[in-house]
Amino acid sequence: MLINKLLLKLNKQERKAIKEFKIRLRKELGEQVVEIKLFGSKARGDSHEESDIDILVVLRADSEENKDKIFDIVQNILLEYEVLLSPIIFNKQEYDSLNSIPTIFMQNIKFEGVRI
């Protein structure tokens, strides 16, 4: 399974932080969460010690309240695990629309992104 191979490239704190982020996100936003993907250097396996962890979060509908909740979770993860998560947040409609445009950013998410 791809996720297992990916997780082996992450250190123990990073694995714990990602797992906890997913748990808290699902607890706080429940059915609003459509998809969570790891992408960027951590997903490619070419990160360095100072690399952050890029995470795509797709919500059914985004709002300032939902974004605030996500950033509160990220801040708490940083304090507890000393792991910097960098979420990119889209609503489902934005994500689908952007997916139809062949930008480098969206191509990277499509090809290197790993669902968590």
Label every model-predicted segment.
Residues 54-57:
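Short beta-strand->loop micro-motif that forms the acidic, two-metal-ion catalytic signature
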Residues 1-34, 44-49, 59-116:
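Catalytic core of pol beta-like nucleotidyltransferases
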